[in-house]
């Protein structure tokens, strides 16, 4: 019965999220009605880990220290009775012990304006909550509490004040020919400049030169095309660590423009995966013509600030190697350094591609690829139980656990060890490490298909990515993930890690959606006029889907204390 009630409440919350995008976990709320309180406990119980973490952070033994989340460009100043609410926790609720008014003022830096649509302040209780815009552009927030009343802990932590930027950074790329003639195969000389927008970056503006070419697999076929950039000199753009290698990702299939962005930003602090690409939003102009909002992101490579390993050489071919898992249709057999995949998740042959180092010597390349063939077969045998060697001798559990969690949260159809999956092997170390999360523009419920067809051997076991329920990569035809998940040690580490992340990086993932929606709210108007993508509906759908997905994963992975 409890699970049925939870699902019913989840459905109500999902509908609410479409109508009121910021009411993500707020359950209701300010009441002394015992029947209403009882109905909320079912939802609160499912969030007990989140609630416990919130109490530990905000309750000081005497009351609640109220701390609304604020975006860039926002500054909070307490007013009146301040930001401390006298009271005590009571299971999933907080009981006020004093009648008082919670008051603060939000001020905004130049170029930033308050976004009421993507901010949230006790939205389910309009009688007690007041948001008032003042003549000087600041906004005053007031919430009146009464002694003896209760409020859901999740409502106290849901408050956020988010602002919209007047302008995004502007990235100009100019070449001597039309961009229609640019291909994925040949670099074209380019003049490249970057002018900062409203958001402050210490790296400042940029004027320089480099090269550009097309990039992507299916994304290259869309009208809004992605590009790779190679600067002439290592440079920090938008505070991304110095590198020559950048890309601009079009996010054409993603009406929110942010699926890749929130993934890369939220997961910078993973425990097991030691590198996630850095990125920022930009307005892109190609030969002076506006082409929409893109994500400027550093390209994956072996570098000090990225994947910091020593490259293999002729004296030591055990590593290090940067490897991408890819499929038959996306491999260039003439140019790529290809070696075999021991399993067959597709009807045609699966492959690994050695991305770095690029080996010029033909004989050394042959020797290295043969070494990697043998290595991957030994790894496969250990994972599948075909040899006496343990999988822990070849699999770095910490990074693989993180990889599974991230891909399952997003139900990423490109993240099931078939394509766009990156890993590395260090020299004199047998373990394979997952790294560099990449390519989430078809994740988080954006499509209803799953890559489950006869060509990919998934027709019977891989669920649709549009649903909240079921596993994606664990149930896919890649046998490694499924086999690892069957190991008690791996599965226990995964559930412990998920429980830890539920109040840290996953909470950050959720909070980034309204925050970045507010940030892009003005800039996306021009993007909409060009590409006709419904941003607001996309944001609401993304929030609803992610909340539903986490509800299901909580039931199977969350460890209740």
Question: Where do the PLM segments sit?
Answer:
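Structural recognition of the beta-strand scaffold that forms the well-ordered cores
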Residues: 226-230, 246-250, 257, 265, ...
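Conserved NTP-binding catalytic cores of kinases and kinase-like/nucleotidyltransferase enzymes
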Residues: 98-99, 108, 114-117, 156-262
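Short, well-structured beta-strand/strand-turn elements
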Residues: 269-283, 412
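Middle-to-C-terminal accessory/interaction subdomains
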Residues: 216-218, 222, 348-417, 421-425, ...
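Beta-rich interaction/scaffold domains
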Residues: 26-160
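N-terminal Sec-pathway targeting helices
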Residues: 2-11
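Hydrophobic core
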Residues: 13, 17-21
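Internal "kinase-insert"/substrate-recognition segments embedded within catalytic cores
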Residues: 235-236, 250-252, 272-277, 290-405
């Amino acid at each position: 019965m409890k699970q049925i009630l939870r699902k019913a409440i989840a459905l109500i919350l999902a509908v609410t999220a479409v109508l009121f995008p910021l009411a993500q976990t707020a359950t209701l709320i300010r009441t002394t009605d015992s029947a209403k309180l009882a109905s909320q406990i079912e939802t609160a119980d499912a969030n007990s880990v989140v609630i416990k973490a919130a109490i530990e952070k905000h309750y000081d033994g005497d009351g609640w220290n109220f701390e609304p989340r604020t975006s860039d460009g926002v500054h909070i100043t307490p007013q009146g009775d301040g930001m401390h609410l006298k009271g005590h926790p009571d299971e999933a609720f907080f009981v006020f012990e004093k009648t008082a008014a919670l008051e603060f003022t939000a001020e905004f830096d130049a170029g930033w304006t308050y976004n009421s649509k993507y901010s949230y302040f006790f939205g389910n209780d309009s009688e007690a909550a007041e948001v008032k815009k003042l003549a000087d552009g600041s906004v005053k927030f007031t919430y009146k509490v009464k002694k003896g009343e209760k409020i859901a802990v999740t409502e106290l932590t849901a408050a956020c004040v988010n602002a919209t930027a007047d302008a995004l950074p502007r990235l100009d790329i100019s070449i001597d020919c039309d961009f229609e003639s640019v291909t994925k195969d040949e670099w074209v000389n380019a003049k490249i400049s970057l002018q900062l927008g409203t958001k402050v970056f210490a790296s400042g503006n940029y004027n320089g030169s480099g090269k550009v070419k097309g990039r992507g697999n299916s994304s290259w076929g869309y009208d809004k095309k992605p590009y790779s950039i190679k600067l002439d000199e290592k440079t920090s753009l938008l505070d991304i660590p110095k590198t020559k290698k950048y890309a601009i990702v079009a996010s054409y299939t993603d009406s929110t423009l942010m699926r890749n962005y929130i993934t890369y930003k939220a997961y910078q602090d993973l425990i097991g995966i030691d590198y996630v690409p850095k990125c920022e939003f930009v307005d892109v102009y190609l030969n002076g013509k506006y082409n929409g909002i893109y994500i400027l992101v550093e390209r994956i490579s072996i570098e000090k600030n990225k994947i910091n390993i020593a490259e293999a050489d002729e004296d030591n071919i055990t590593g290090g190697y940067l490897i991408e898992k890819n499929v038959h249709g996306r491999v260039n057999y003439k140019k790529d350094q290809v070696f075999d995949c021991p399993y067959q998740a597709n009807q045609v042959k699966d492959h690994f591609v050695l991305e770095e180092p690029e080996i010029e010597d033909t004989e050394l390349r042959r020797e290295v690829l043969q070494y990697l063939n043998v290595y991957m077969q030994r790894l496969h045998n250990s994972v599948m139980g075909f040899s006496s060697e343990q999988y822990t001798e070849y699999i770095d559990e910490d990074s693989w656990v993180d990889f599974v969690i991230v891909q399952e949260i997003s139900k990423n159809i490109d993240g099931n060890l078939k394509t766009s999956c990156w890993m590395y092997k260090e020299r004199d170390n047998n373990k394979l490490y997952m790294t560099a999360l990449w390519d989430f523009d078809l994740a988080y419920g954006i499509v209803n298909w799953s890559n489950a067809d006869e060509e990919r051997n998934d027709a019977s076991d891989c669920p649709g990515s549009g649903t909240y329920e079921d596993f994606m990569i664990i149930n896919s035809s890649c046998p490694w993930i499924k086999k690892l998940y069957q190991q008690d040690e791996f599965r226990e580490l995964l559930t412990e890690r998920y429980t830890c992340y539920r109040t840290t990086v996953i909470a950050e993932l959720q909070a980034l959606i309204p925050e970045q929606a507010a940030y892009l709210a003005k800039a996306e108007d021009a993007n909409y006029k060009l590409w006709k993508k419904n941003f607001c509906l996309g944001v609401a759908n993304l929030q609803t889907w992610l909340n539903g997905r986490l509800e299901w994963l909580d039931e199977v992975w969350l460890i209740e204390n």
